[in-house]
Amino acid sequence: MKVVLAYSGGLDTSAILVLLREQGHEVVTVTVSVGQEEDLEEVEERAYKLGASKHYTVNAVEEFAEKYISMAIKANALYEDKYPLGTALARPLIAEKVAEIARKESADAVAHGCTSKGNDQVRFDTMLKYYLGDDIKIIAPVRELRLTRAKAAEILRRNGFQPPGLHKTYSIDENLWSRSIEGGPLDDPMAEPPEDAFAWTVAPEKAPDQPLYLEIGFEKGIPVSINGEKMHLAKIVSLLNRLVGAYGYGRIDHIENRVVGLKSREVYEAPAALTLIEAHRDLEKTVYTPRELRFKRILDQEWSDLVYQGLWVEPLRATLEKAIDELNRWVTGTVRVKVYKGSLMVVGRWSPYSGYSREAIDYNHGWYPSDEEARGFITIWSLHSLAAAKARSLWG
């Protein structure tokens, strides 16, 4: 049987590759680059050493930025107000590329390294079923065999291979949008994450003593420039990860509700994601009416939940994106942010579509409603609330 394996080069997928070869299967490995800081040539070399008959490295960084990250920014995507969906966003794209190669190779099955306790199994299986239907079988050895990291390492040693990354305290997943850190001391929700868990951000107390100011330009909701310099979104994200992370901003530590019914302690680094979403939300407040703003928050939450829950194929997502895109037509302008020792504050914003009027809001000059106008407005505005309050007070 020919199996196409979504291969990260880590411990689990390396053990799966050896297991599949032990079972007599031909294995074609696929590594999809979505911005992870990994030596992809080394990953390819490892795949061949472990017995892959063919290896594909797919560069999908630009596509990840332009198709997935851009919409996450427009949707202010923060699952449970914290997690910017880095891993969740990348899985549909990786599954798509793996499915394409499975078709190209006329594979009998595709395999992945997801555990039965995680969200990724839902994301991968759902997308693979969408692209491959029932023609190509989905194999999940970690789930099927309840494969622990210790067992995976033993499989590799038994076959004469050194387990990759076994010395690491943490399980890491990273891409252009975020870096996820799990395991080790982080499994204790009361334990502060040790500094060795972080790679993209410095400790805030060790950040520079002078603040960093940045001006981020947006066009129709999408970041297009930093300090006036136009650049592609992938470059903007990469640059902000480096610049903002150096000032200690971008760390996330929270309890997360997984799709599979478990609560997990999750630690992330996402300097660019948090910066761009904060700037985008501020620009939205500058241009939207109050009703648009409230409605947009509903759209954002629904979109974020669908993506987190592995339902990229859900038709509602496309419907939500049409509304999100329509509202983002007006989110054009510049946002100025100040980053200092682990904090970020928006300190300026401008848009040609701004509803803000300096003249109207000035308390010393300009337009003022008359006393009669104000009294009339307050009377009408408060009618419902006053009537209900009085009626209910009668009944205790």
From Swiss-Prot:
GO cellular component, one term: cytoplasm
Cysteine disulfide partners in this protein: none
Alphabetized InterPro entries for the sequence: Arginosuc_syn_C, Arginosuc_syn_N, Arginosuc_synth, Arginosuc_synth_CS, Arginosuc_synth_type_1_subfam, AS_cat/multimer_dom_body, Rossmann-like_a/b/a_fold
Protein localization: Cytoplasm
Cross-referenced CDD domains: ASS (cd01999)
Molecular function, one GO term: ATP binding
Binding site for ATP: A6, Y7, S8, G9, G10, L11, D12, T13, S14, G113
Chief location category: cytoplasm
Catalytic activity: L-citrulline + L-aspartate + ATP = 2-(N(omega)-L-arginino)succinate + AMP + diphosphate + H(+)
Family listed: Belongs to the argininosuccinate synthase family. Type 1 subfamily.
Protein name: Argininosuccinate synthase
UniProt xrefs under SUPFAM superfamilies: Adenine nucleotide alpha hydrolases-like, Argininosuccinate synthetase, C-terminal domain
Binding, L-aspartate: T115, N119, D120
Subunit relationships: Homotetramer.
Keyword ATP-binding: yes
Gene: argG
GO biological process: argininosuccinate metabolic process; L-arginine biosynthetic process; urea cycle
PROSITE patterns assigned: ARGININOSUCCIN_SYN_1, ARGININOSUCCIN_SYN_2
NCBIfam families noted in UniProt: argG, PRK00509.1
Keywords: Amino-acid biosynthesis, Arginine biosynthesis, ATP-binding, Cytoplasm, Ligase, Nucleotide-binding
Highest classification ranks of the organism: Archaea, Thermoproteota, Thermoprotei, Desulfurococcales, Pyrodictiaceae
Binding of L-citrulline, residues: Y83, N119, R123, S171, S180, E256, Y268
EC number from the UniProt entry: 6.3.4.5
Pathway it works in: Amino-acid biosynthesis; L-arginine biosynthesis; L-arginine from L-ornithine and carbamoyl phosphate: step 2/3
HAMAP family with a match to the protein in the record: Arg_succ_synth_type1
